[in-house]
């Protein structure tokens, strides 16, 4: 008779379980067939042993084993308030519980004690939804006490993501040294190293006598090589507390070599400085100015995220600048010189504008010594070099000046051997390289001009390999890549061997384009291209070169055609900037 017949069906009442639970709760509320009272102090809640035993391993062990409680009519639960007990029993019979800021902690503790994992996770989810920089450290500790991994993970993520705000809270000063060290050393910490250092010092000074001995251990978690040199000079190097520790002094001396020396630290000192920036930093591609859609010079500033593939507009340049130059230094953007275009008139400028990604604002910087446009600029350590260009009298400039970002001053450096326009420029191994360009008669110059940075001297080398004009150069690995320049050709120059290697050609003959490096790949933007019938067209192309495979791939199109623009890589923490 138990065998299923061919025409048999299985009926399942979807509402039966919930109806049964509702009826059982009605019996409980009417005290019908109840056989035990769960008590908290003077509060007694009548229940059914079989329902409780079925709902939780805790009650199953209590009522189905030979414990005293299995025979008692009243069972006293310690550590649970009467209100919380009533809410838990109501949950057992209905599957519902109202969670609020007022009851979430006692409910969570009761759920942990009485072994109701779903209610426990519901409380955890509620707390996760309430997480903020002001409470995340406290909730990390609560999660540890309650062994709630999901809450601990989420609360720690908030603490790391919003570390500058968390560092300002009183809770940070109450961390033990192990906890603080774990936060400061975490690669996922989102915050400038200046903020990391300030948090360390605030924690130590909160209880100086007891915490001073941890200074060295904590200072080693700060990635000093990424601190702005001016901040290091003014607030760290001369700090009396750090100077009182020989071990901290040694760390600071090593940092000084990395931050201030033209050469960097010696080989034996390099171990500390191999640490990359924290993983919260991302590289973004930045386009500034240039000629847009064959119109007049634009003030637009565009940002591109490789992660999202999206373009975003940032604060416009303060004025229209024709053939200015731009660089990034210490995660700020510097726009130098150019011809300021106002009401159809051009004024050659020595002005410097500095852009803060964090504030999405421009400000004036210290002006250059000479007004120039069509010049080239590059950076090395704490310096910006502004090279050549055209002067106020439309003369071809052979001069070079250097900006010291620590002292905020410009100073004249040695003139280049031969004044050229539109060369490709890059810095590698303490040397500044100028490839090609054109002379005053617009003839291509087949020269490499090399500037020794620490000696302030130039020399030049003739080569038949060079014929580039209006081409950018970038450093990619150990090579300097010269990208086009009225040609499709891509040349990789090895400074050590003084040899060129030809790479895969671009699709078009390009000039007046931009190029930058992100993630060991070369990105080329816009420019002008020579068509097969020798016409010149503005370009909106956006291409990527992979040196590993020696291949080009299209990244789509720029928002519009663009040439004579700046193309830079800017590193920042997305949620701490105008991107958020």
Swiss-Prot record:
Xref: CDD domains: BACK_KLHL38 (cd18476)
Pfam families, per the entry: BACK, Beta-prop_ATRN-LZTR1, BTB, Kelch_1
SUPFAM superfamilies (UniProt xref): Kelch motif, POZ domain
Keywords on record: Kelch repeat, Repeat
BACK domain mapped to chain residues: 136-237
Keyword hit for Protein transport: no
InterPro entries noted in UniProt: BACK, Beta-prop_ATRN-MKLN-like, BTB-kelch_protein, BTB/POZ_dom, Kelch-typ_b-propeller, Kelch_1, KLHL38_BACK, SKP1/BTB/POZ_sf
Gene3D superfamilies linked to this entry: 1.25.40.420, Kelch-type beta propeller, Potassium Channel Kv1.1, Chain A
UniProt protein name: Kelch-like protein 38
UniProt source species: Rattus norvegicus (Rat)
Gene of this entry: Klhl38
